[in-house]
Amino acid sequence: MRWEELEDALEVLETEREYDGYFCSIKDAVIIVILGSLCDLQSVKKIHAWATTAHVKTFLSETFGIKRIPCYWWLLSLLALVTPESLNQCMKQWVASLVPQLAAKLEKEEEEQSKKKNKKQPLTIAIDGKEIRSTGKMKKYDSPLHIVSAHIGELGLTLAQKTVESKSNEIPAVPKLIKALEISGCMVVTDALNCQRETAKAIVEAQADYLLSAKGNQKELMNDIEQYVQDEKLRATMDSVSRTEKGHGRIESRSAYTSGDVGWHPGGREWPALKCIGAVHTRFETSKGVTDEWHYYISSKVLTAEETASPCKNGMVGRIDALAFGCAL
């Protein structure tokens, strides 16, 4: 990995007020936090302990010229000076520079598998919102803030993130986030909250495809798909795949169904480029009993049951690293 690209991206960092860089620059502090986050360290305290180990100090010195590691409280103070918007822009720029390299590597690794399928699989972009719990106690906010993120499932990278002041504000924020990204040719997956016509429209206009989860907030849509899927004769005509997994004291059975037969649906004209409906049935068997769940989906692409099952099972929802961002708040 070329670390120069990270340093270049951080050149546009902005701060709430001026700082002379005495002892440790803000850029160095952010680099330490980013690298610690990549090592799956989930608090600034753990990152500081990691950064002060001998081999990490040597790496930081030789790679980035960071000669001094600030104490834990000083590291927090430096991060608090960073504006969230500029940090988000820096991360978007850095991740964008990495995507072509990682995508090429992924394509090479899956070359044999792709040959068998005779088609190239698109990258999956997951749109998801997470609550920043610590912000609920801050006087300037009536409720905890939320981060809406766009995550590349196959590469384990977050493309971009946007803060909103409540969960309901995620809905108008998602189309804006999508319009700011280059996602042409990708498959965009969202949770039920963001199964919205405006979101679907933004995805299609970005020349991408969507796979949206239909639940209670789109009750009529969910009920229509449910009636179709639960009709045994109609379900028998759908493409399907089933698998069973055992482990951790439970048996999980999963079945996926898809159909390109959407002409009957009255909302076909309302949902942009609607071409497919799908369902995933999950059954869990444990010592405590048996539970089962049905989840319903719509897509702008005619998908096989296998294609539907994969992103739905894995969720494709990546962890947003909010350490530096949360401190900046």
Give the positions of each predicted feature.
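Short, conserved catalytic/metal-binding motifs centered on acidic residues
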Residues: 32, 47, 71, 75, ...
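Domain-level cores of phosphate- or acyl-group-handling catalytic modules
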Residues: 165, 171, 175-216
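An anionic, glycine-rich sequence signature occurring as long contiguous blocks
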Residues: 215-315
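Short, flexible loop/turn motifs enriched in small residues
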Residues: 138-146, 290-291, 318
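Dynamic "connector" segments at or just before major functional cores
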Residues: 1-126, 135, 149-161, 175
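Short amphipathic alpha-helical "interface-anchor" segments enriched in bulky aromatics
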Residues: 6, 52, 302-329
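Electropositive, glycine- and tryptophan-enriched low-complexity nucleic-acid-binding patches
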Residues: 140-186
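Short acidic (Asp/Glu) and glycine-rich catalytic loops that position anionic groups and cofactors
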Residues: 11, 55-56, 205, 289-294, ...
